[in-house]
Regions:
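Bacterial N-terminal signal peptides that target proteins for export
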Residues: 1-8
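C-terminal motif of bacterial Sec signal peptides marking the signal peptidase cleavage site
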Residues: 15-17
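Residue-level hotspots at or immediately adjacent to binding/recognition sites across diverse folds
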Residues: 20-349
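A generic structural signal for short, non-catalytic loop/turn and secondary-structure boundary residues
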Residues: 8-11, 38-39
Length: 349
């Protein structure tokens, strides 16, 4: 694994209900995962907006799901809201060709991006509004908390910075190297704590936590790169990091300690979200990152209290999880038996 692999999620879309008995695992001494038990989850196909590929990114306590999907007969993809079996196209900014939804809060407000830069946007009761960031720089909104605070990144080329948007005011969160290096914010909890990653002046990329105006370097699992993707109400942080041996492993950071969550079915694991109960979701298996297709053999997982449970698919050869709500409902994407990638929902039986 090259040590310079960037862990940041790109803007590119990576892209039958079924029930299966899955395998639960716990990390062993060598960082991999050992078989310990079996658990049953139901995988539900949420479909697409007519095209052959869709991915679910987030789910709120009410079970509303957001993500993006290709449209029928076009190369365009649009943000969607799925609720009670119905997937709704959220549209784009005027003249826009694509949009994507990255997060949804308990009130149903959705954030993401839309073509035209792209630019960070928020959907409120179906009304799409562009967030005011800085000049005409591209931007993307990655998460929104119950208070309506939004985080993401803005900028292009040599300068990309994390931002916090609150009640119409945008704050540049800075980086580990001031204005000279890049940063991105990916998640925010109810307390307003923000996580993401930042370059350092020495050229490394580290997971970071912003809390009360202070940025904290969360370190790595021994390599030179890490990236945080989720934070719980209690301040537990999840993400992925290069290890000393050059593999990418999921981590859980709590009270100053970063723990390797191990892998299953291959050398790779990536954590993408965490809920209030400390349940962590992501994907594990062969060494293929998001945007690199096809990730044959990868499986979505949920990790809790040292146990990694590998989830099933919609009949195809891979699945990935990207979000989890307080009820433990998990969303992501999976290959179907028909060879399409559909948005997916996993629930515990």
């Amino acid at each position: 694994m090259p040590s310079n692999r960037v862990l940041l999620t790109s803007l590119a879309l990576t892209m039958l209900a079924c029930t299966s008995e899955e395998t639960a695992t716990e990390p062993s001494s060598d960082g991999t995962s050992a078989l310990v038990a079996a658990a049953a989850y139901t995988a539900v196909d949420l479909g697409t907006l007519g095209g052959g590929s869709a991915i679910a990114r987030g789910i709120n306590p009410a079970g509303q799901v957001v993500g993006e999907s290709f449209l029928e007969g076009t190369s365009s993809f649009h943000a969607f809201l799925w609720e009670k079996g119905v997937m709704t196209d959220l549209g784009t900014l005027p003249l826009g060709q694509f949009s994507g939804a990255r997060g949804i809060n308990p009130a149903g407000r959705v954030v993401g991006f839309s073509h035209g830069g792209p630019f960070a946007v928020v959907w409120d009761d179906g009304v799409l509004t562009e967030l005011s960031t800085e000049a005409a720089f591209p931007s993307v909104a990655n998460a929104i908390n119950p208070s309506g605070q939004v985080v993401g990144s803005f900028g292009s080329g040599l300068r990309e910075h994390a931002f916090l948007w609150d009640k119409g005011v945008l704050t540049d969160l800075g980086s580990l190297g001031g204005d000279q290096v890049n940063s991105v914010a990916t998640a925010i909890n109810p307390a307003g704590q923000v996580v993401g990653s930042s370059n350092t002046l020495s050229g490394e990329r580290h997971a970071v936590l912003w809390s009360k105006g202070v940025i904290t370097n969360l370190g790595t699992l021994g390599g030179d790169r890490s990236h945080a993707t989720g934070i719980s109400p209690a301040g537990q942080v999840v993400g992925s990091s290069l290890t000393a041996s050059g593999e990418i492993h999921a981590f859980l950071w709590s009270n100053g300690v970063m723990t390797d969550l191990g892998t299953q079915g291959g050398p790779l694991s990536v954590a993408t979200g965490i809920n209030a109960a400390g349940q962590v979701v992501g994907y594990t298996g062969p060494d293929v990152l998001e945007g690199e297709e096809p990730p044959v053999g990868q499986r979505a997982f949920v990790w809790h209290k040292g146990v990694m449970t590998v989830l099933g698919t919609l009949g195809g050869s891979y699945s990935r999880a990207f979000g989890i709500n307080s009820a433990g409902e998990i969303v992501g994407t999976s290959l179907t038996a028909g060879g399409e990638t559909h948005a997916a929902l996993w629930t515990r039986k």
